[in-house]
Amino acid sequence: MTSSKPKKSSRVRKTTKNSKKNHNTMMPLLPKTPPSFKNKVVDKKALKNLVSWAYKTHGTAVTAAMADNLKDLGFKYATQAAVSISVNDLKVPEAKQDLIGQAEAQITATEECYRLGEITEVERHTKVIDTWTETNERLVDAVKNNFNQNDPLNSVWMMANSGARGNMSQVRQLVGMRGLMANPQGEIIDLPIRTNFREGLTVTEYVISSYGARKGLVDTALRTADSGYLTRRLVDVAQDVIVREEDCGTERSIVINSEDGKFGSRLIGRLSAEDILDSEGNLIVPKNTAIDPSLSKTLETSLISKVNIRSPLTCEANRSVCRKCYGWALAHNHLVDLGEAVGIIAAQSIGEPGTQLTMRTFHTGGVSTAESGVVRSKIKGKVEFGSKAKIRGYRTPHGVEAKQAEVDFLLKIIPTGSITNKAQKIEVTSGSLLFVEDGQDIDSDITVAQITSGAVKKSVEKATKDVICDLAGEVRYDKVIQPKEVTDRQGNITLKAQRLGRLWVLAGDVYNLPPNAKPVVSTETKVEQGTVLAEASQSSEFGGEVRLRESVGDSREVQIVTTSMLLSNFKLIEESTHSGELFHLESNDGTIYRLNTSPGSKISSGEVIADLADERFRTKTGGLVKYAPGLSVKKARSSKNGFEVSQGGTLLWIPQETHEINKDISLLMTEDMEWIEAGTEVVKDIFSQTSGIVTVTQKNDILREITVRNGSFHECEDEEILSRFTEEGKLVNPGEKIIDGVDNDEILFVQKLETSKGKGLLLRTVEEYTIPNEAELPELSHVKQEKGPSLALKAIQRLSYKDGELIKSVEGVELLKTNLSIESFDATPQMTIDVETIQDKSDKSINRLNLVILESILVRRDTISDSSHGSTHTELQINNNQLVKAGDVIATTQILCKERGVLQLPDSVEGEPIRRLIVERNEDKIKINIKDKAVVKTGDRVVDGDLISKGVKSTSCGEIEEVSSEYVILRIGRPYMVSPDSVLHVKDGDLVLRGDGLALLVFERQKTGDIVQGLPRIEELLEARRPRDSSILCKKSGVVQIKEGTDEESVSLSVIERDDSISEYQLLMGQNIMVSDGQQVTGGELLTDGPINPHDLLDCLFTDLKDQKPLMEAAQESISKLQRKMVNEVQNVYKSQGVAISDKHIEVIVRQMTSKVRIEDAGDTTLLPGELIELRQVEDTNQAMSITGGAPAEFTPVLLGITKASLNTDSFISAASFQETTRVLTEAAIEGKSDWLRGLKENVIIGRLIPAGTGFSGFVEELASEAGPHPDILAEESGGYRRTQNLRPDYTVDMPQTPIVSSTAILDDPSDEDLETTRNRHGIDPTSSNFAAFARPNAENQFSEDQLPDPAALEGLQEEGLLSDG
């Protein structure tokens, strides 16, 4: 058996002197006890325990053989049994219908309470959900009992029960009920799926069911990715944690407390930090002993409540963990081996179960009830609260009135009648609920109280729910509500209820009035069906001629022509082309304009309606444009529409024919600078249209462009004449001399040219176009209103090209366009101009263009009664073609009454229109006949079942309207309970329709406990995220002082600290105080509810301890408290999901997160303020300071999330391979960092053997060889970190462990001058040695041979008083 242990472990564990002995005691070859026979069912859990026991007792081989046999056994019987599932195996328990019936009865009762206004909407919802949750649980029990008693060998039951496949929650859905589902927002739908998959779901249930199914699939997909990333970050942060030492020798430890007298598995495999004695002083566990299950049991039986154990959290090994602090390796239940990569194991252990955690759980109302114990009376008696009791009224989440204890006290039930019974005593904790009154007589088995475990002041958050009205009518408040106007910081005014009370809606027929409608009947008037209740009129804004259009849909359009303009001087000519209809306007003198719009379209002011087709300004070819002096244009943002002429003048045009081609040069049929006649073929198949000089542009033997320029070429060698002209060209006026022999009697455009024949001038003729100052327009007639919009036609001349522009074209171009645009004045922007055609009055064959501005009024058609507007009847007050003035009524709409009743108008503020009115109908009232005198009076509000008169009860809810001796008239109403602080959306007397919001209930529900869970919560903890709306923590110990403010809600919270200074704490909206006045609090304690910000907690703990203890102790203690908190929080998440992880794994990760401190003040050290550095390093530096008398560095501990900790590691290779590669490498290069390749990652990247497992011994040997002739510099297994304790010859001072920073003088005091003087006085040659006491060692080689302290130097320093004797 022993030989089954791998050989390598003996090599790695070579430092354990008694490892062999241990080995034998842990793994006996045969059990001492004879085999025992156990007759019980072995399910999944029992199988797990069996294999685990075999492995721990008998080792790998025996366990493997046993597991193999068990497998064969299982398969053998599974083959014979032939287990399969058929539909018949899904047996629905008979109790199901009864259970569902009971639940429905409870819910009906709850709904009735809600209808009577006894509970709020929130309480109803919570109660319904709790009822179904409880029913579901009871149904699961019924399913279990049904299978157990009637069919224990049922296939489905066996599979789920043995753990082979499926679980109870799945079986429940198959044969119980599917249960409650959550919607995509995570809120529970209060309609449960009552059926199961065996019975089949209804359509509604199927749709609701698919919500949950989809959520499950999406969650699984996201969870896998999130969990993988979490594992990667954990591995990165902890990869360099390797067991490198036997024992770090720390005196620090952590405390493990027993839970209900039991330690469970929390002590197993941990080493005791001190001797553990029982109550009589006998030693149970010596110091540094591994606690195995039997020792753990012994501790429990000895009633030991807390044990100090060693932990990676308190291990003082430098950058690693020692064997004693880590304890057992859980793989083989032995002390961990040297070189074990415990960091990676920890990361895997925490990351791997990530996929098993749910992403989030949703809020199920009433979570709180499960955590509290209901106490019932055991005897009949009288309740006594005692003098200490402090209670206040409280309403439970289900709407039950109760009392809540504010302090802890003892409640007694004093027996009445029987003297033999003893009084029942109940310890009531603060926050517990009491369902009895002081002095009340009660029977036995009555619910007395609901005790909350511990002083749990629940962390709650505010949530809201809308109250929706489900009948139309008039709103009335109960007086108790006491609405109050509250103004928030932004100045918004809201109406809030101050007390719990009812908001009533009294039934009636409510009518919505259109915006401009006015009631025509006074209040309290009796109305019949068809009575006109209100009238709304529609009037014309500008007036004009009426046109009635055919009605479309449910409205009819009335058009009023406010302005029209007839283009009487133009004929409209229609021309059909293949691309569609074209329209032209022809004036009396024959000028033709192209119409840019078509009849029937709408145009806006300033739009061009037509262009003048003017052939006078059309050229034959392309060319160059020049403006003669005097011609000017307006500046325009864009040249798209041309340039508007501001001043007329002459436009000069130099023709030039340009062919843009893309052909091979071989196709060219003329030469560059050759004169050609019109019609010459210049390139194959391309002919010139004008005579002139050819210019050829080519690139890479490809023809690009051929230009033909008109004019005559004159050779000229005279440089003086040539210098007057450029290649771009220049205009020459008539009579101006150019060259001899050339007379110019017109304007010429002269260009300098160089041809193959020589230099010369090209004289080009210029065409002149005269542009008038304004375009000529035929006369127009138009109608102008006295008031309102008017129209005008305007002609605009636009030049197509700017001065100096070259138009490359063969075809002609249009140089000037004349546009006709329409302008409207005094029109509103939304008014458009309609284009119409009308026949000429004298000649019907001629059509004219008419431009009109229309005012369009939509008139509602009659409607037969709808739910909110009633019946409407609309009458037109005008006829077709009638002329109306501005303000004349066009149509009136009447709102007609639907049923007979009495009209009531709401109270309105003067100047505000009435938007709704109500008719109280006969069916909204109930007449209740009575014989005796009524016990109610007019104005009283009653609910179903209230007494009206002797023997007569109300049959409905509502308000008493009339009381006589024979009858009572009740107006039907509906009460809605609103809780304090609810926001009221309606005022007393408002009229509401069905579906309107009445109020917004503000209620408290448990916070975060059941909102963020599973993976996101783990991530939040390990990344040390700052939660939103975190709680306020006490900064320093002291006594709480709570003062009520002037305003009801405002409370001031302060703490009187030890030195009598007062710290005030600013409370945020909705924060509940968790402490009471006069309570003693310590730093880091919760003052208000909410999630804890771990960074704040560390700050508060450190700030408080810093005043009481030395800096180093305060830092260690505050870090230690935070570490325990973090470990417990992470464990809680995993435990809540049923995942078991050993504490030590989480401790390794948390150790990495809390190992750094931030330097606040460097003192005399060479550290930098703001630098993040290992706590150990600062400790060593400050120790050196205390020896040499320098000012120590001041620091604060910091908590880093796993990502940040990974990036802040000493190894830049590891950090760069994780995230932000460029930044990490750049910074490392600038700082000139060295990577000491301590972790696994760095070594893998470089390609070296990793310093763990079998590579660890090589690592130690390598370090030993580095140490050279001073092997004692290395501690026993320091894992490569020189331990300076061994550098202590008799004559040295007590040397500190020196920090790891660059080699420079550490100190400013004593100064370099002091040292120099001391050396000189004692005759020490400064070049002969390097002083360990005065210099900072190198980063890795902490002390080399020549750095050993010089005895003469040290004696000299002591004489000078600069060093105290160590």
UniProtKB/Swiss-Prot annotation:
The keyword NADP does not apply. SUPFAM superfamilies: beta and beta-prime subunits of DNA dependent RNA-polymerase. Residues 1354-1366 have a biased composition (Low complexity). Residues 1-23 have a biased composition (Basic residues). Zn(2+) binds at C248, C315, C322, C325. InterPro entries: DNA-dir_RpoC2_beta_pp, DNA-dir_RpoC_beta_prime, RNA_pol_Rpb1_3, RNA_pol_Rpb1_3_sf, RNA_pol_Rpb1_4, RNA_pol_Rpb1_5, Rpb1_funnel_sf. Binds 1 Zn(2+) ion per subunit. Its EC number is 2.7.7.6. GO terms for biological process: DNA-templated transcription. It comes from the Bacteria. One of its GO terms (cellular component) is DNA-directed RNA polymerase complex. GO terms for molecular function: DNA binding; DNA-directed RNA polymerase activity; zinc ion binding. Residues 1-37, 1304-1366 are annotated as: Disordered. It is an enzyme of class 2 (transferase). DNA-dependent RNA polymerase catalyzes the transcription of DNA into RNA using the four ribonucleoside triphosphates as substrates. Belongs to the RNA polymerase beta' chain family. RpoC2 subfamily. This is DNA-directed RNA polymerase subunit beta'.
